[in-house]
Amino acid sequence: MSQPHQLALMATSKQQRTVDLICGSFDLNDRRKFDLKNADGELVIELFFKPITRADRLRAMESAGTEDALKISTNMLCQMAELEDGTKAFAMADAVKLQRELPENVLNDIELFLHGLGSEVGLGEAKND
């Protein structure tokens, strides 16, 4: 093996793998807070969400047992929502009740936030409020 080739192999082995570099650049424990308020603007509950991974999305699709985006989204909500102490806010079986008994606009607001389309407050900011 030529010396330049050996040097290239040594440099590569000391460098971090691309996948590790990319994955290590994001903190999957960094939670965002959603304040659920009632029609009078009073706080009902604070929900917290970690970033969604592709594996999370696939698990929600599998548990929904359908390609219906609304059902998948509510399953994702039940799977990802946490209380402040990190415990799960919902059981997977709660998806049906949320779809049946929660006003559509409220469920939409929570799910849009979950998917990063609503207003965001990071946990650091939330604790400073």
Residue ranges and their predicted role:
Residues 40-129:
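Short, surface-exposed, charged amphipathic helix/loop patches that serve as local interaction elements
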Residues 1-66, 128-129:
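Short, charged/polar N-terminal "headpieces" of proteins
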